[in-house]
């Protein structure tokens, strides 16, 4: 993890619903605990991190302090565009240009324009010299990127616009962003998955897409919510014997209610235990698929509880500190 945290930008992405925000938050906690001024960036109108830390969201475009050395930001493409234009041409002309029908049409209609603007803002956050002199830079920026397909589109937007514009400020800015994304010393990529066939397949496709578009690959794959393998072979055999030895359930008679309840409990418990074992074995088989493809894999234990709260994310951060 030390080498990862030495980069300026870490991109966290993967299949939808696998826990990308959870993992990005956990890495943010870990980096902050190590004294790095850290920012976790959300996109696509997401602003969930303040709530995790018991705070009210400040709205898109506001860098919010979550705790010592840790901030969050939900990128607002319109605000980012205004900041960029003001940096290029001054406050007044920037506002005029941003409000012009030409630029509004460009950002609304040009495919990938909002993605490019978001990536430009993320690039700016990694710089020691920010667009506004009073803004302070960060040691590490964590991008909680969209799911795989949208993330790849977002990451390739600088190259697309550089090819379209060729010269001028858009081409120059796109080149700077692309250089960051392709620099292994400054930028790293983490895939997040779960132990399912679809998530593993999408992780493989993500790695291939990064290599194709950016000549980069995944530094590691973090497999979230992995169930423990609790039972030995002998214990599984004993569970099978217990399940097979319980007679078929019938309606209890007045004199057999206690035995009926005991048999019912035994059957339910053994079936549940065997189902959990089968699920865990399936997950570990999927993790083995990733390892056979030479990915560095880190498994995150399933967090049991009514909800995934800050203590659970802290436990994940502690686990990552030991494994990466």
Predicted features along the sequence, with ranges:
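Phosphate-binding P-loop
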Residues: 1-7
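Conserved catalytic-core segment of NTP-binding enzymes
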Residues: 2, 18, 22-26, 33-34, ...
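The Walker A (P-loop) glycine that initiates the GxxxxGKT/S ATP-binding motif of P-loop NTPases
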Residues: 14
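Short, solvent-exposed amphipathic alpha-helical segments in soluble enzyme
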Residues: 27-29, 57, 89, 206-211, ...
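N-terminal phosphate/diphosphate-binding loop that engages ATP/GTP or pyrophosphate donors
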Residues: 29-99
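ATP-hydrolysis module of ASCE/P-loop NTPase motor domains
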Residues: 83, 89-126
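NTP-binding/hydrolysis catalytic cores, primarily Walker-type P-loop NTPases
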Residues: 293-324
